[in-house]
């Protein structure tokens, strides 16, 4: 089920003539109580505040903050898990630093949090421009940061001797400028005997070790996990519940639906809007699953707009928990963090940026400074972030400037991620006319602009002011709302083929929008039709759907093409580009595939199964062993064919940055050499180098005239594993 915003009054779509019209639901109606069923829980609306606030702080703080160590590029909060892996860097580090008799639970007692100042934390979050935070109430180590009556494995009975969650929530809810406060909660615990059925052991001696503070219960979920979740909900009234560890078991094991229904109903009775992350798992719990209120990609950003609400989480460096082994160069710069926030918001996402406090409760100075830099930028430019929504498209593709768009009622914001110089070039489809006023936030003076020979809007910029990213505010007198158009039309069509879909026209603002006339233009020789030529006036949040059908000529050249959707609303006329690519057949679908090695039971065949889902939890991505030298994946097309190129779908979760600096090769003969240099320079091999991180998809073109039966993708990295969501080899059969 598609997630909907509480702002939206839509309850259904009815056919009126050839036009589908959204029927509004009165705000005053009291929604029914939620039932512990998938259908009922998935009908819960995304809170308005969550969609408006855009920026939150994630906090990973636990006993793992005592050793505060992990290999570069790893998660320090997974210290205990890595420590129990013989031969791992963490296993070796622990033995060398603490000795083989030192157990992980020693850190629980050593954790004092003696410098923890919740008021200071909250002030920092506010100064950073964040509107909410999510505290790790319990990570996979099992240490609860609240006074749990279910388990003595908490920060009141062990370590700090304080209810850390209570103190932070109280600080956040002081005064008028309150922060929304949420809990992360790990459903499973690595070594809880009540979950695993066995006592944890010393990884060096094999001797059993205690699991401090936790009771032994008969049913981990019924007697331990669910009661703890209810403690958090009933005792702390969180605004967000954010689960993790859901991948371990199916939804039928976790049984979270009852707790979530009670949480929603409690909020309903109290007139409160709350949100639950999809990892709380009532269906698949995959990071991109539309279940519950929002998706949760990790160290990944959607490649384009996703109308289903999502929130990307990541650390300032790679680890969520504090990792003293991460040097400054492993941390994102303030410029990169601002750019990431802008990019995410333009695609209908929120950014949940993690900090890892030290064991004593202080926040590392480097992390503090990054947050303050973001806050300084948001103080000037926040109107382009808070309370905005996505536009027709997220960015300017193919233009000279790297720009992201957001919209609020009748105002369009164009944010340049880099200073554009004397002129900023924007698309020809912008909603502007002769009276449009363009200013730069932080400057305020009206800027002159014109259209170039291609119809693009060219803005003459003021002297550079500010830092990180530059927001240009575009307003037209009398235009109170800007409509948004999205299309379900397929992104590709075969020569001579026909594709159909729907065009959705939405008023995302807070005021009524006037009627709109529609036209559709297509390249010469194409056929394109709309199911209606007019959209009636739309109230706030209303949408209409218009059928659309497109047929490509049989002799069309495989290339990207563009349809033009013309819209006239009042005196404003705009043309929106609808991209459609003509592709040759996918020759690799279902063909035999191999890879250098296989890790995590993820075979090479997954990359030719027709499923482009890039999330690991979906079970459709490949994976080699880890680490692996110059990892490769290859496919046998069955026969030689003229090849146009290869579309590669990257991972969309934690590991997208691994697929870069790679080669795509084609050959008439099988590849027989594991060495990259020898493989790509072998006789008859055509090889194309890709330096940047692959997209989803990323298209790699072969030189004209390339033929081949075998196609290989190979990393240059001496250690990174290769993981692919899908590979489509395009050519003529």
Segments (PLM) and residue ranges:
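Aromatic, loop-rich ligand-recognition surfaces of beta-strand-rich domains
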Residues: 430, 471, 476, 584-587, ...
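Mature catalytic domains of secreted/periplasmic carbohydrate-active enzymes
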Residues: 29-483, 647, 689, 716
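Short, surface-exposed loop/turn segments at beta-strand-coil junctions that are enriched for proline
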Residues: 464, 551-557
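Short acidic/proline- and small/hydrophobic-mixed sequence motifs that coincide with surface turns
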Residues: 510-516, 659
């Amino acid at each position: 089920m598609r997630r909907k915003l509480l702002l939206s009054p839509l309850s259904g779509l009815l056919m009126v003539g050839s036009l589908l019209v959204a029927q509004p639901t009165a705000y005053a109606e009291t929604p029914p109580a939620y039932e512990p069923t998938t259908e009922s829980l998935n009908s819960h609306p995304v809170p308005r505040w969550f969609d408006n606030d855009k920026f939150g702080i994630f906090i990973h703080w636990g006993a793992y903050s005592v050793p505060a160590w992990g290999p570069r590029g790893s998660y320090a909060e997974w210290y205990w898990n890595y420590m129990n892996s013989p031969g791992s860097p963490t296993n070796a580090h622990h033995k060398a630093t603490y000795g083989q008799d030192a157990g992980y639970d020693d850190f629980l007692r050593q954790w004092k949090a003696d410098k923890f100042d919740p008021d200071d934390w909250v002030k920092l979050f506010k100064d950073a421009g964040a509107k909410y935070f999510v505290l790790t109430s319990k990570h996979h180590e099992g240490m609860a940061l609240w006074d749990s009556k279910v388990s003595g494995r908490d920060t009141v009975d062990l370590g700090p001797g304080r209810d850390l969650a209570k103190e932070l929530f109280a600080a956040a809810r002081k005064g008028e400028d309150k922060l929304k406060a949420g809990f992360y909660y790990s459903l499973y615990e690595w070594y809880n005997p009540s979950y695993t059925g066995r006592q944890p052991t010393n990884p060096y001696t094999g001797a059993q070790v205690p699991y401090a503070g936790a009771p032994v219960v008969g049913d981990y979920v019924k007697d331990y996990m669910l009661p703890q979740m209810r403690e958090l909900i009933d005792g702390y009234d969180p605004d967000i519940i954010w689960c993790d560890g859901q991948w371990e078991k199916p939804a039928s094991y976790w049984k979270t639906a009852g707790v979530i229904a009670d949480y929603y109903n409690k909020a309903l009775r109290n007139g409160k809007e709350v949100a639950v992350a999809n990892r709380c798992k009532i269906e698949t719990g995959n990071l991109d699953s539309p279940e519950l209120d929002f998706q949760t990609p990790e160290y990944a950003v959607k490649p384009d707009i996703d109308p289903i609400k999502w929130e990307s989480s990541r650390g300032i460096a790679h680890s969520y928990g504090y990792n003293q082994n991460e040097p400054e160069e492993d941390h994102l710069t303030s410029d990169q963090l601002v750019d990431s926030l802008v990019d995410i918001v333009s695609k209908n996402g929120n950014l949940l940026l993690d900090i890892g406090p030290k064991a004593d409760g202080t926040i590392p100075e480097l992390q503090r400074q990054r947050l303050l830099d973001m806050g300084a930028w948001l103080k000037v430019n926040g109107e382009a972030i808070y309370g905005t929504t996505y536009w027709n498209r997220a960015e300017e593709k193919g233009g000279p400037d790297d720009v992201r768009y957001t919209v609020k009622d009748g105002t369009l914001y164009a944010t340049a991620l880099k200073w554009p110089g004397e002129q900023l070039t924007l698309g020809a489809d912008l909603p502007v006319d002769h009276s449009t006023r363009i200013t730069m936030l932080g400057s305020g003076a009206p800027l002159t602009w014109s259209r170039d020979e291609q119809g693009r809007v060219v803005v003459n910029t003021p002297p550079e002011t500010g830092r990180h990213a530059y927001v240009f505010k575009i307003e037209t007198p009398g235009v109170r709302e800007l409509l948004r158009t999205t299309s379900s039309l397929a992104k590709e069509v075969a020569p001579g083929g026909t594709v159909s879909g729907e065009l959705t026209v939405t008023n995302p603002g807070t005021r009524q929008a006037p009627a709109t006339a529609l036209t559709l233009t297509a390249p010469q020789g194409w056929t394109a039709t709309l199911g209606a030529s007019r959209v009636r006036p739309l109230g706030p949040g209303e949408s209409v759907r218009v059928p659309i059908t497109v047929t490509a000529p049989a002799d069309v050249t495989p290339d990207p093409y563009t349809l033009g959707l013309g819209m006239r609303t009042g005196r404003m006329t705009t043309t929106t580009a609808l991209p459609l690519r003509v592709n040759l057949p996918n020759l690799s679908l279902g063909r035999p595939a191999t890879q250098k090695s296989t890790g995590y039971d993820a075979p090479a065949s997954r990359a030719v199964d027709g499923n482009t889902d890039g999330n690991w939890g979906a079970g459709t991505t490949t994976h080699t062993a880890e680490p692996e030298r110059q990892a490769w994946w290859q496919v046998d097309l069955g026969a030689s064919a003229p090849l146009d190129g290869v579309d590669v779908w990257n991972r969309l979760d934690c590991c997208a940055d691994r697929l870069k600096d790679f080669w795509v090769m084609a050959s008439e003969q099988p590849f027989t050499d594991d060495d990259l240099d020898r493989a790509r320079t072998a006789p008859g091999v055509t090889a194309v180098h890709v330096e940047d991180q692959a997209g989803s998809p990323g298209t790699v073109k072969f030189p004209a005239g390339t033929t081949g039966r075998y196609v290989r993708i190979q990393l240059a990295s001496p250690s990174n594993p290769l993981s692919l969501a899908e590979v489509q080899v395009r050519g003529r059969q």
